[in-house]
Regions:
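GHKL/Histidine-kinase-like ATPase module
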Residues: 6-145
Length: 146
């Protein structure tokens, strides 16, 4: 929760022991710090975490991502701070847009020849850590338990 809402401070205090224990969760960088945390046991391929945010039609979107030296993709989606399954629209849209952007860049800059096939999404997302956070009014979650 603290990663997903930059500036939010959550303080947990256990007063049961003689000496109370307190733990504070506060991440001013929000999802950028979340990506940094998830990549702590890997070596990033570039220093700066790619980050963008915007609001359109009362929908707020934040994306933070960074490639690392692992072979695994770790992309996580959230709607209103609730984790979402892998196949939801904002994750699929992010993956498709990322693949298209890489391929368009590669073609425009002659990194791929006209007769060569496009890069696959799996190749582009290898070693990728990404957080996609969407905030919307009146969300509808399939299978949501009340």
């Amino acid at each position: 929760m603290a990663f997903l809402t930059k500036g939010l401070k959550i303080v947990l205090r256990d007063e049961r022991p003689q000496e109370p224990i307190e733990k504070t969760f506060h991440y001013e960088g929000g999802i950028k710090e979340f990506v940094e945390y998830l990549n702590r046991s890997t070596t990033p391929l570039y220093e700066q975490i790619i980050y963008c945010e915007g609001i359109v039609n009362n929908v707020s979107v934040e994306v933070a991502m960074q490639h690392n030296d692992s072979y695994n993709e770790n992309s996580y989606g959230f709607v209103n701070n609730i984790t979402t399954p892998e196949g939801v629209t904002h994750i699929v849209g992010f993956r498709n847009a990322l693949t298209k952007t890489f391929n368009d860049y590669a073609r425009k800059n002659k990194l791929l020849k006209d007769n060569e096939p496009n890069l696959t999404g799996e190749d582009i997302r290898e070693g990728l850590t990404a957080i996609i956070s969407v905030k919307i009014e009146d969300p509808q979650f399939e299978g949501q338990t009340k």
